[in-house]
Amino acid sequence: GGPGCGNGNNGNGNYGYGNGNGNGNGYGNSNGNGNGCGPDGKGPGCNSVSSAGTLSSYGQVVGSNVYSANGCGPDGKGPGCQVKPLSLPKYFFRKSSQYPRRKNCSPNEIGCN
């Protein structure tokens, strides 16, 4: 993957309070440094109090701890990024395919629509 598609491998896990700061290298030159989600589903990296997933933000790697968090790269990609509901593909149908215009065809021309 390119920059930003990264799993952060290092993080501080606090089992008692469920807070964990997740720091880790992403693929390419992106570093996934962010907040972890504790094993009790709580912490700054959790989607909600009952979620076991992690969210993290882009940053530099700090430390080398044992628990993991997912990294979100600067391009908004990676397992730690929130899914954006309006992220549509950046291509559109050509108008010519939506609204075909009749060509000037000679009566016996083959393959002219």
Swiss-Prot record:
- What does the tissue specificity note say? Component of the organic matrix of calcified shell layers.
**Source organism superkingdom:** Eukaryota
What name does UniProt use for this protein? Answer: Gigasin-5
- Organism equals Magallana gigas
